[in-house]
């Protein structure tokens, strides 16, 4: 199918606007690069805000534009994805991004007035302080809201920061999707600069969240009843670092993880990005 000239002109207009207003995006830790060979593709990086569970994390998206753009929305694929962890109700482990503006979620649907620029800001709002509240029917008093924030905070450092940097800067995991890694590498300079500038802040972020979620550290969860019990005494926890572990279960998505907060700072400190 040939590409409509109106579609080409509109995509070019959207990209030109982003280039002219890049500072307003970067000030919100949003970055966009359009494919230099295929006008129907674009790529985005959103760095999580510090006051959310996504703090300093690198979240990548691929845009695939339809031949009738802007009368239909682009298909947006989520790339910061290990295939197991559900980082957000709107971000599926198969890469699907569910947003009303993309016609993939209930609510106000896509119109031709929307642009790449507006989509980027909408995506950034998904990475919010209490992401589980994006799930229909979940209220602030739900048992999983606090636990899910804790899990996302942990996996954000482990995967969206440390693993992503190892993939991009050190080619660590050859089994990871090569195409996705190539997209991530388009932003390598930004990753290197921001991590170098924020390394100590990331450690502070880890420490702050360790205090914030102190009630969940050293707590094990019965995955059937989702009840809690303290696994070790405070004195034992202070004397035995390996006991600072949480067996966490998020019933909404049936996520089960063994978390050890002590390893996160080590993962960060081991990263030396030139």
What are these regions (language model features)?
Residues 1-57, 68-274:
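UBC/E2-like fold recognition across ubiquitin and ubiquitin-like conjugation systems
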């Amino acid at each position: 199918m040939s590409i409509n000239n109106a579609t080409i002109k509109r995509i070019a207009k959207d990209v030109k606007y982003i280039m002219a207003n890049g500072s307003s995006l970067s000030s919100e830790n949003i970055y966009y690069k359009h494919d230099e060979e295929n006008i129907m593709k674009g790529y985005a990086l959103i760095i999580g805000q510090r006051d959310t569970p996504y703090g300093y994390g690198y979240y990548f998206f691929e845009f695939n534009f339809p031949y009738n753009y802007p009368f239909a929305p682009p298909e947006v694929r989520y790339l910061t994805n290990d295939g197991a962890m559900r980082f957000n109700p709107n971000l599926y482990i198969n890469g699907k991004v569910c947003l009303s503006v993309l016609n993939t979620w209930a609510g106000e649907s896509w119109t031709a007035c929307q642009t790449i620029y507006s989509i980027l800001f909408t995506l950034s709002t998904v990475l919010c302080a209490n992401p589980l509240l994006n799930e229909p029917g979940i209220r602030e008093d739900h048992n999983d809201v606090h636990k899910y924030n804790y899990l996302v905070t942990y996996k954000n450092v482990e995967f969206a920061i440390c693993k992503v940097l190892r993939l991009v800067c050190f080619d660590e995991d050859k089994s990871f999707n090569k195409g996705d890694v190539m997209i991530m590498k388009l932003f390598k300079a930004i990753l290197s600069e921001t991590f170098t500038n924020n390394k100590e802040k990331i450690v502070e972020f880890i420490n702050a969240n360790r205090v914030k979620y102190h009630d969940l550290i050293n707590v094990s969860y019965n995955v059937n009843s989702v009840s809690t019990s303290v696994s070790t005494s405070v004195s034992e926890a202070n004397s035995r670092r390996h006991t600072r572990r949480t067996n966490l279960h998020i019933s909404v998505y049936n996520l089960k993880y063994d978390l050890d907060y002590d390893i996160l700072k080590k993962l960060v400190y081991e990263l030396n990005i030139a």
